[in-house]
Regions:
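Membrane-interface extramembranous regions
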Residues: 1-135
Length: 135
């Protein structure tokens, strides 16, 4: 299958798992935050399902499609995480539109945005690290 396609497939599984977090009893607190940090809503769930579908389709299509997914997804999620770090709200889930700039503690913003920053950065890295595979 190749590394690019395998990584895209792993992203699909991970994104579908994240989309299901709100529906697994015991993982959300009284405020509806998964693990006490992530306030997931229908916009987040739709974003993660759509991203997971994109990852799965890319993984099943070709190495080139997987590389395009990893790079595009990586850029989108990395910039969303960086905006969330700066403003407290991201753009992919319409948070910056629905909630505006939020005055949150820096530690909380780091914890809340680290998954998008990490997943995005790794996607961009993997798309470059394995670019010869897609040629």
């Amino acid at each position: 299958m190749g590394k690019l396609r395998s990584i895209a497939l792993a992203y699909m599984v991970g994104l579908f798992l994240v989309a299901s977090l709100n529906y697994i009893p015991g993982l959300t607190d009284s405020e509806g935050r998964a693990f006490g940090v992530f306030a997931l809503d229908i916009y987040d769930d739709a974003l993660h399902v759509a991203s997971g579908l994109w990852a799965g389709i890319a993984a099943m299509t070709s190495r080139r499609a997987a590389r395009i997914f990893l790079f595009g997804f990586g850029l989108l999620y990395l910039t969303d995480g960086l905006l969330g770090l700066a403003a407290g709200s991201g753009y992919l889930d319409l948070g910056i539109i629905n909630h505006g700039v939020l005055d949150l503690p820096l530690t909380f913003k780091i914890l809340a945005n680290l998954p998008h920053i990490g997943a995005g950065a790794f996607g961009v890295y993997a798309s470059y690290r394995h670019k010869a595979e897609a040629a």
